Amino acid sequence: MRHYEIILLIHPDQSEQVPAMLERYKGLITAGGGKVHRVEDWGRRQLAYQINKLSKAHYLCVNIEAEQTVMGELEHAFKFNDAVLRHLTVQKKKAETGPSSMMKTVEREEARKAQQAEYAANNS
């Protein structure tokens, strides 16, 4: 089996359906004998350029281990799901289970904001 990293850009109006969509894709992967190593929900973010007249999208990052037949089914599901604006699949050499650089950036930003709030509360 091969390791893959999949990035999904989902229509911002469909953000509530992201967990159900993710479960459906996980079901496809596990039914084909694959494994899901990491799922990161990056949330709603600004796009670099407009896609279908939209300037924001809901981002998901999924690291999986699966056969090529399962990947074909997933690609087919992505293409025919109107909520998926774009998808990118990259083959990896090994399974990635730690936080991605995007999540590390988000965690650093949250820690910085918490530290500023604590500093402001102490100096008031």
UniProtKB/Swiss-Prot annotation:
InterPro entries attached to this UniProt entry: Ribosomal_bS6, Ribosomal_bS6_CS, Ribosomal_bS6_sf, Ribosomal_S6_plastid/chlpt, Transl_elong_EF1B/ribsomal_bS6
Region feature Disordered, mapped onto this chain: 93-124
Transmembrane segments: none
Keyword tags: Ribonucleoprotein, Ribosomal protein, RNA-binding, rRNA-binding
Gene Ontology annotations for the cellular component aspect, listed alphabetically: cytosolic small ribosomal subunit
UniProt entry tagged with the keyword Kinase: no
Key word Ribonucleoprotein present: yes
One Pfam family named in its UniProt record: Ribosomal_S6
PANTHER family, per database record: MITOCHONDRIAL 28S RIBOSOMAL PROTEIN S6, SMALL RIBOSOMAL SUBUNIT PROTEIN BS6M
Protein's name in the database: Small ribosomal subunit protein bS6
Source organism of the structure: Variovorax paradoxus (strain S110)
Name of encoding gene: rpsF
